[in-house]
């Protein structure tokens, strides 16, 4: 996994794009640390979104979009994970994926299911770009393939 601070987000992010990136980071943090949604959301709103941290300027993000993603993923995880599991092969099982990759796929799938006002291409491209910001290997291709397949089933 590449260090996000050492790489640039592939395209200039708007506030929703920044919210997606922050949501993936927050979901990762919640998975690793075990913190809750409200605690994590408050931390991001107070100390991260749009803030300067150790010389790095975090992007200004749409806080409501960020909150909807992290809240939705946590609430719907028991429905999201089986759907993702069906799309993954034995060597890429959900439990074997890197935590950040799981966060990317969960957030993207939640958005595909729940935000039908956002075009499929936007969701797929944004989360593939997020994957590219963290990974240099095949992971972005995996994100693209899984989301493309899921979108065809969810958004007929």
Swiss-Prot record:
It comes from the Bacteria. Pfam families: NusB. SUPFAM superfamilies: NusB-like (SSF48013). GO terms for molecular function: RNA binding. Coiled coil: none annotated. GO terms for cellular component: cytosol. One of its GO terms (biological process) is transcription antitermination. Keywords: RNA-binding, Transcription, Transcription antitermination, Transcription regulation. InterPro entries: NusB-like_sf, NusB_fam, NusB_RsmB_TIM44. Involved in transcription antitermination. Required for transcription of ribosomal RNA (rRNA) genes. Binds specifically to the boxA antiterminator sequence of the ribosomal RNA (rrn) operons. Belongs to the NusB family. This is Transcription antitermination protein NusB. It comes from Bartonella tribocorum (strain CIP 105476 / IBS 506). The gene is nusB.
């Amino acid at each position: 996994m590449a260090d996000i601070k050492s790489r640039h987000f592939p395209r200039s992010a708007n506030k929703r794009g920044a919210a997606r990136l922050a949501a993936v980071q927050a979901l990762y943090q919640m998975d690793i640390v075990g913190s809750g949604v409200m605690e994590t959301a408050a931390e991001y709103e107070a100390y991260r979104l749009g803030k300067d941290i150790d010389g790095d300027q975090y992007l200004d993000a749409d806080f409501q979009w960020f909150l909807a993603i992290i809240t939705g993923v946590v609430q719907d995880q028991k429905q999201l994970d089986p759907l993702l599991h069906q799309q993954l092969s034995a060597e890429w099982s959900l439990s074997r994926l890197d935590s950040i990759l799981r966060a990317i796929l969960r957030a993207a799938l939640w958005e595909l299911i729940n935000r039908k006002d956002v075009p499929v291409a936007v969701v797929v491209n944004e989360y593939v770009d997020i994957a590219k910001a963290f990974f240099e290997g095949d992971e972005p291709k995996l994100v693209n393939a899984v989301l493309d397949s899921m979108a065809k089933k969810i958004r007929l």
